[in-house]
């Protein structure tokens, strides 16, 4: 084992240890969580595997040891933007670094090879495709490579959302070297199965593993199902013209229309998608990075490897195709540690768009037909998980962390679900109407139709297709005419989530499941959590005046809150705010129905905490009778 006082021998100085390098070269006084463990592993000659959230400091785990090890560190990355930005930052810090990728001209590449052979670089970034180039192989065999860092390591797994067959060649490349170097794998988004794949395929040897967790506590998550996405977007951006943010759209056409909308309303917005020329993309990206433009409207082609720390919000105008993609894109907010918002605008049309893009996508030409079909199948599975996120009423942060296999508190206190006020509503009648409509449409046509057409039928729309198919004549036509489009689709989504409906993927047609019979024929009750968006008639403040007796009960309720919070390992305010406890002390509810009328008590919190607080109130009343 090498000791951790291995000296720094690069051109930056002599004899520096890691703490001194961290401060003097990179400007940090201390390591972030997990960094030192991985760095020590590399310096001791062990393979390492780091799973850290976006903005968690992965690059330090290979940049710093590169300066302390003899020879060269090779960083394999698919991100051209990241290569350029990190090499630029390293050079500014005085670290000799270079990148080798397709953006270099022939003469530039030859000059880089000469400098490499002359020992003028400590860190070299390469794209995985470069490993197969004959010219590169001839240069590499003459080098002393002490460390290979594989960035975005999830790309090696077919279970990963960004599978790249070129990553599978990395092991062959390592095996071809005269001496096997230390190997490190780094990623921000990897489920348990992807982590296992990475370790197995890269043939990591008893690696030092560090999973710092996927949680980004400074990010606020919310899903909104608006009537008008444009109006909602403008409302969200009101008063934020000086803040930097990214708005992701699913298609180039939508990027253009949203960017135009924002510019028309006085926002300094620019755009980014694959349909623009490389020169325009580069200019627009620089305008955003250097704050000449504050809002970037883009497809998912934007952002990989972009290291802009002051992004205050990421809004998804459309639903992404996977949790991995969403968390990676949303994670570009708040990289400076400041509070930031991650908002997703969702409607049923997003599901259709995502399925179309998956079923018709051919953006990875490295794959053969069999690989593409397998990836398509996995992408559809990931899409189902993403749809679940958009429809859940449980903690959004918890949903994401569950997906990545990380334990978490029941409530985070910093997402739309935890801060929302939900009430359970009986929708049995509406459910029977919807399920009956699905059946009657099939009886009339001999086939099933999609959610949009069902919604039009139920709301009594004079839609041309409804009339052409004669669906304005069936008995369920117009029975939900008093409901908004959003309400109707929310109920359709809920019935699917509860297992009464299923959507066939190929044509997005909606079918009844066997469970639907329980509601249609046996009167099973169906309830649905609905967010109460109105303001309470009489807002209760924390400073509300309490009688002496009420103040005593208030103190008892605070003690119970603290006890529950400690058990759940969450902040006390996440259980209930002081304002809610004050209202509770004044109203002294005796039943669950009364408890739900306390300001700040929603259906979910009532289910979790109601019994304990009701017992506390009753005990207090008994003792003071």
At which residue positions do the language-model features occur?
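Helicase motor core with emphasis on the C-terminal RecA-like subdomain
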Residues: 6, 12-25, 29-33, 37-59, ...
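Helix-turn-helix/winged-helix DNA-binding modules
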Residues: 30, 178, 306, 392, ...
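Short helix-to-turn junction characteristic of helix-turn-helix DNA-binding domains
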Residues: 42, 237, 288, 390, ...
């Amino acid at each position: 084992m090498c000791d951790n006082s291995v000296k720094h021998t690069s051109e930056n100085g002599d004899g520096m240890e890691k703490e001194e390098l961290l401060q003097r070269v990179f400007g940090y006084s201390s390591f972030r969580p997990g960094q030192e463990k991985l760095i020590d592993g590399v310096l001791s000659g062990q393979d390492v595997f780091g799973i850290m959230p976006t903005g968690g400091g992965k690059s330090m785990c290979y940049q710093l040891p590169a300066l302390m090890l003899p020879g060269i560190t090779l960083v394999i990355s698919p991100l051209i933007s990241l290569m350029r930005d990190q090499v630029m930052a390293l050079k500014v810090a005085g670290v000799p670094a270079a990148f080798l990728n397709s953006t270099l001209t022939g003469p530039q590449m030859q000059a880089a090879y000469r400098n490499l052979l002359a020992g003028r670089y400590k860190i070299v970034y390469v794209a995985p495709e470069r490993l197969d180039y004959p010219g590169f192989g001839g240069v590499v065999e003459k080098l002393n490579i002490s460390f290979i860092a594989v960035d975005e390591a999830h790309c090696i797994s077919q279970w990963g959302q960004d599978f790249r067959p070129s990553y599978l060649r990395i092991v062959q490349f390592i095996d071809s070297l005269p001496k096997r170097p230390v190997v490190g794998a780094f990623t921000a988004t990897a489920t348990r199965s992807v982590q296992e794949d990475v370790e197995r395929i890269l043939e990591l040897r008893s690696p030092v593993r560090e999973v710092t967790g996927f949680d980004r506590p400074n990010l606020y998550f919310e899903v909104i199902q608006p009537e008008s996405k444009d109006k909602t977007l403008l409302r969200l951006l009101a008063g934020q013209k000086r803040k930097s943010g990214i708005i992701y759209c699913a298609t180039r056409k939508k990027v253009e229309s949203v960017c135009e909308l924002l510019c028309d309303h006085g926002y300094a917005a620019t755009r980014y998608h694959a349909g623009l020329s490389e020169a325009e993309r580069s200019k627009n990206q620089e305008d955003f990075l250097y704050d000449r433009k504050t809002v970037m409207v883009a497809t998912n082609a934007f952002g990989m490897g972009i290291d802009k720390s002051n992004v205050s919000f990421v809004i998804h105008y459309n639903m992404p195709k996977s949790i991995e993609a969403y968390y990676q894109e949303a994670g570009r907010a708040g990289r400076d540690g400041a509070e930031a918002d991650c908002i997703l605008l969702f409607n049923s049309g997003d599901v259709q768009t995502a399925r179309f893009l998956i079923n018709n996508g051919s953006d990875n030409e490295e794959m053969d037909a069999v690989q593409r079909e397998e990836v398509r199948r996995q992408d559809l599975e990931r899409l189902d998980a993403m749809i679940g996120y958009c429809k859940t009423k449980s903690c959004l942060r918890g949903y994401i962390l569950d997906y990545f296999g990380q334990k978490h508190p029941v409530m985070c206190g910093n997402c739309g679900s935890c801060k929302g006020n939900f009430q359970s509503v009986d929708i049995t009648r509406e459910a029977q109407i919807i399920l009956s409509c699905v059946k009657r449409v099939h009886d009339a046509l001999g086939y099933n139709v999609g959610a949009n057409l069902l919604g039009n039928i139920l709301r009594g729309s004079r839609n041309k297709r409804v009339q052409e198919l004669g669906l304005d004549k069936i008995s369920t036509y117009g029975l939900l005419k008093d409901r908004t489009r959003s309400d109707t689709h929310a109920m359709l989504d809920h019935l699917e989530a509860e297992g009464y409906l299923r959507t066939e993927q190929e044509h997005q047609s909606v079918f009844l499941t066997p469970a639907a019979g329980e509601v249609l024929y046996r009167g099973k009750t169906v309830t649905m959590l609905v967010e109460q968006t109105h303001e309470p008639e009489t807002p209760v403040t924390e400073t509300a005046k309490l009688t002496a007796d009420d103040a005593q009960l208030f103190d008892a309720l605070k003690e119970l809150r603290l006890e529950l919070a400690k058990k759940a390992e969450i902040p006390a305010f996440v259980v209930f705010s002081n304002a809610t406890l004050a209202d509770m002390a004044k109203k002294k509810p005796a039943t669950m129905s009364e408890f739900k009328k306390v300001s700040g008590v929603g259906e979910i919190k009532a289910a979790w905490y109601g019994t304990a607080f009701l017992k506390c109130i009753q005990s207090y009343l008994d003792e003071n009778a």
